[in-house]
Amino acid sequence: MKPGMVRGRMVQIVVLGIGASWIVPVAAQNRAEGKLDVDGKPVAITQVYAYAKEGFFDKKKQDVVVLLCDAPVPAPVMRDTFAYKDLIATGKVHCVRQTIDADKQVINYDVGHQRFGSLGENGGSTEHVFEAQTFDGKTIAGRARTKSPQKSFKDVPYTYDITFSAAIEPKK
């Protein structure tokens, strides 16, 4: 091999290594463990994503959306409600989404499972809670759960209890 080719390869390897070292800590920081139980059938939740958005009740503050799923969700789908609902309807993922305000209150929830149909199970309820461990604008960690067994609009019983930690992606 020519010295110039070797040097070029070495530069590529070093650049890739540096890039990977920046990505790995963020990915390693995101973790989820728990379950979503729909109609007596448990689903293990292993993925978590979090992103900031403009506050619904106070535009000067930010809300954080936490998406907890049993399978990876492509980045473009994470913030796209219609694409997200398509994944749910086809049974490719099962998810719990909570929108949490600056006061650490769940102001909206969505439980995505094909058993609920295309609309899913969503709304606002004090029965869906977030118990914060970390909530500093950069990281969100804690427990997302239902206080008691719930019933969907179609009378399908469900509960969830998930602990998680995730880096918060900035507003877009």
Give the residues covered by each predicted segment.
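A mature extracytoplasmic/lumenal domain signature
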Residues: 40-42, 49, 83, 88, ...
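Bacterial N-terminal signal peptides
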Residues: 12-22
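Surface-exposed helix/loop patches within compact recognition domains
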Residues: 56-134
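N-terminal targeting signals for Sec/Tat export/insertion, comprising classic cleavable signal peptides
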Residues: 37-61
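C-terminal or internal capping secondary-structure element at the end of a domain, subdomain, or sheet
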Residues: 134-172
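Amphipathic hydrophobic-ligand
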Residues: 41-45, 121-127, 156-163
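N-terminal secretory signal peptides that target proteins for export/translocation
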Residues: 1-8
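Boundary at the C-terminal end of the N-terminal hydrophobic targeting segment
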Residues: 26-28
